[in-house]
Design a protein with these regions (language model features):
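Pyridoxal 5′-phosphate
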Residues: 1-387
Length: 387
């Protein structure tokens, strides 16, 4: 049977044009970009072309783009690099309670090294406000980090407003845009971002490659030491095929952004409407207003989300119960508990994230099969609980 893949927030398939762009850089143009011979120079040209493609998508200079191994490295680099580079000013950082663990765990590591971190709460839809940030700012605050879009519930944070506030107050502002790039329009100038993280595998590029935008003039210490790659900011021989794939993927994502967003918004709303009509006691997590166009997150009273996942998988449907980075954890989602769900409600959650290949037939098949799965599991739970 044809499988239906609705876990695109975890990762996406490499598109055919991206794969075709990458292939020559495995066996034909395979030189080290730091080498001065022609094969190395050809590799260097490919790296710089990809850098321009990323810069074009973000509205910045190519010299402000640095390639990394992905979103987690970019987030680690921002927090540790900015913290150590600006510790003479202070050791206070502001973030939110619903950030990706690449942010939260790095902040916890910094706390163990003597930094202080304020974790802002969010409302029932997952929003933080610029006013909250302003209230938390101190004279020793060196960095504010707020994600552009939440990876679990799809909430689009008011990052432009927060960025403007940070600039006005002379505090560095970073946004983790891993889920947002390729899904919504982004411009670093409009966002007032000093730094921005992204990862190729979230928009049909390869895994293991990402980038960090660092505004010209912003001081940040390196995370990885060694050679002089990435203008001395990030050591290590460049992942040439990956960089080429990232460049092509972000170029294609930007070209089809408006069309894909409109189509996925329609399909997302169709999915939510269908499930709402067919499944009683189902909660939609997050807002319907300012939400990623491909994100659906729901909770079912009385059953475990993991059980729903297993049954869906048997039916040929791939989904998730939250962030792929926390799969296997016995703890409920920190995002869902932060927006007010109980542990049981959070454990009964299901995340369905659409992709560019998702069809209306896929959505209708999920609406057809999921209500029966939920009803069956609820019946089993009720039977097992009888005294």
């Amino acid at each position: 049977m044809d499988r239906i893949y609705l876990d695109n927030a975890a990762t996406t398939a490499v598109s055919q044009p991206v794969m075709e762009a990458m292939l020559p850089y495995y066996m034909q143009v395979y030189g080290n970009p730091s080498s001065i011979h022609s094969t190395g120079r050809d590799a260097k040209k490919a790296v710089e072309r990809a850098r321009r493609q990323v810069a074009s998508a973000l509205g910045c200079s190519a010299q402000e783009i640095y390639f990394t191994a992905g979103g987690s490295e970019s987030d680690n680099w921002v927090l540790k690099g900015a913290a150590f580079a600006h510790q003479e000013k202070g050791k206070h950082i502001i973030t939110t309670q619903i950030e990706h663990h690449a942010i939260l765990h790095t902040c916890q590591w910094l706390e163990a090294q003597g930094w202080q971190v304020t974790y802002l709460p969010v409302d029932a839809d997952g929003f933080v406000t610029a006013q909250q940030v302003e209230n938390a700012l101190r004279t020793d605050t060196v960095l504010v980090s707020v994600m552009a879009a939440n990876n679990e519930i799809g909430t689009l944070e008011p990052v432009a407003e927060i960025g403007a506030l940070c600039h006005e107050r002379g505090v560095l502002f970073h946004t983790d845009a891993v889920q947002a790039v390729g899904a919504i329009p982004l411009d670093v100038e409009a966002l007032h971002a000093d730094m921005l993280s992204l990862s190729a595998h979230k928009f049909h590029g390869p895994k293991g490659i990402g980038a960090l935008y660092i505004r010209k003039g912003v001081k940040i210490d390196p995370l990885i030491h060694g050679g002089a790659q990435e203008r001395g900011h990030r050591a290590g021989t460049e992942n040439l095929p990956g960089i080429v794939g990232l460049g092509k993927a972000i170029e294609l994502a930007e070209e089809g952004l408006a069309e894909n967003a409109a189509r996925m918004t329609f399909l997302r709303n169709r999915l939510i409407s269908g499930l709402t009509a067919a499944i009683p006691n189902m909660r939609i997590n997050g807002t319907m207003d300012k939400r990623l166009p491909n994100n659906v997150n729901v909770s079912f009273a009385g059953i475990e989300g993991e059980a729903v996942l297993l049954r869906l998988d048997l039916e040929g449907i791939a989904a998730s119960s939250g962030s792929a980075c926390t799969a296997g954890s016995l703890d409920p989602s920190h995002v869902l508990t932060a927006i007010g769900l109980t542990r049981d409600e959070a454990k009964g959650s299901l995340r369905l994230t659409l992709g560019t290949d998702t069809t209306q037939a896929d959505i209708d098949e999920v609406v057809k099969k999921l209500p029966g799965i939920v009803a069956s599991l609820r019946e089993m739970t009720s039977w097992c609980g009888r005294g």
